[in-house]
Amino acid sequence: MFIVGIDIAKHTHQASVMNTDGSLVGKSIKIPNTSVGFDSFISKLKEIDRDISHFEFGMEVTGHYWLNIYTHLADLGCIVHVINPVQSDSLRGLYIRQTKNDIKDSAIIADVIRIGRYCETSVSDDKMLALRDLTRQRFYLVDMVSDLKRKSLTLIDRIFPE
């Protein structure tokens, strides 16, 4: 069994593979945030073990950037753990040299999953996520219309004071 910690970023994610003993396997892997990048990532993992079911994945909830790789891995039937960044930050505090970079972050995420000391973040299905996004967009548009009405009335009152 291998644990893969993925540090999420806007353009390029960083992944570290760890065995159950806590030792890193190979070098960290850069993953472009594209479907081609995800396929290349899976190919690199298959060089370690041909059976993708021997890998468990962990990632932090970071904006919306984690959704694409999460969906890709879930569609492959992989076990994907989504954690709150606060949980990995607490483990980071145990290390003597507390420098922060993507490679170390991905290894820490893998270690959090390996140790099992995390609370899983629930992930809604695609329809619920789409509905959430539409609802947020509607609230944004309603606020914008209200703001434009207020600004228009202010201008009318200034131009035509009577």
Report each predicted region and the residues it spans:
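Anion (oxyanion) recognition and catalysis
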Residues: A74
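Short glycine-rich phosphate-binding loop at a beta-alpha junction
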Residues: S53-T62
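Gly/Thr-rich phosphate-binding beta-strand-loop-beta motif of the actin/hexokinase/Hsp70
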Residues: M1-N19, I109, L141
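Acidic active-site catalytic centers that drive phospho-/nucleotidyl reactions
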Residues: D7, E60, D102-D105
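Long, charge-rich intrinsically disordered scaffolds of nucleic-acid metabolism proteins
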Residues: H81-E162
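Short, well-ordered alpha-helical microsegments
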Residues: Y65-I69
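Short, basic/hydrophobic alpha-helical segments
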Residues: G37-H54
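Short glycine-rich, Thr/Ser-proximal phosphate-binding strand/loop in the N-terminal lobe
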Residues: A9-V36
